[in-house]
Curated annotation (Swiss-Prot):
5-amino-6-(D-ribitylamino)uracil binds at residues 11, 42-44, 66-68, 98. The lineage of its organism: Bacteria, Pseudomonadati, Pseudomonadota, Alphaproteobacteria, Sphingomonadales. This is 6,7-dimethyl-8-ribityllumazine synthase. InterPro entries: LS, LS/RS, LS/RS_sf. Its EC number is 2.5.1.78. GO terms for cellular component: cytosol; riboflavin synthase complex. Catalyzes the formation of 6,7-dimethyl-8-ribityllumazine by condensation of 5-amino-6-(D-ribitylamino)uracil with 3,4-dihydroxy-2-butanone 4-phosphate. This is the penultimate step in the biosynthesis of riboflavin. It comes from the Bacteria.
Length: 139
């Protein structure tokens, strides 16, 4: 049994609840332990994962958040930099599933977050599981 940390940026509570539910369900169904922490925003997710990984308490991570395009350039910065930070950690061997939605509107987010529809939280958890399996295979 592995231990996973879900790191969520809570901004849209109802959407986050669905994403976290999907991720938890996938991890628990696979027989793993799950903990959840909250950070202020998507930009803080990679940093929180890096700090948690130093503790060696967790085997893998799931990043959860929702970034909806607004009227300013902020969307591009948050979407790009959070993904870049997660990818940098992944390239260093950290097993992370990226469940940060980057969408045009709330309707798109709802379809992707809902475990009964696209279940992107569950998909992110399964990606983390797959990366953990690869890391264990090649370690």
């Amino acid at each position: 049994m592995a231990k996973f940390l879900i790191v969520e940026a809570r901004f849209y509570d109802h959407l986050n609840d669905m994403l976290v539910a999907g991720a938890k369900a996938a991890l628990k169904e696979a027989g793993h332990e799950v903990e959840v922490i909250t950070v202020p925003g998507a930009l803080e997710i990679p940093g929180a994962i890096a700090l948690a990984d130093q503790s060696e308490d967790y085997d893998g991570y799931v990043a959860i958040g929702v970034v909806i395009r607004g009227e300013t350039y902020h969307f591009e910065i948050v979407a790009g930099e959070s993904a870049r930070g997660i990818m940098a950690l992944t390239m260093d061997g950290v097993a992370i599933g990226n469940g940060i939605l980057t969408v045009e509107n709330e309707a798109q987010a709802l379809v992707r977050a809902d475990p009964k529809q696209k279940d992107k939280g569950g998909e992110a958890a399964k990606a983390a599981l797959a990366l953990l399996a690869l890391r264990e295979r090649w370690s």
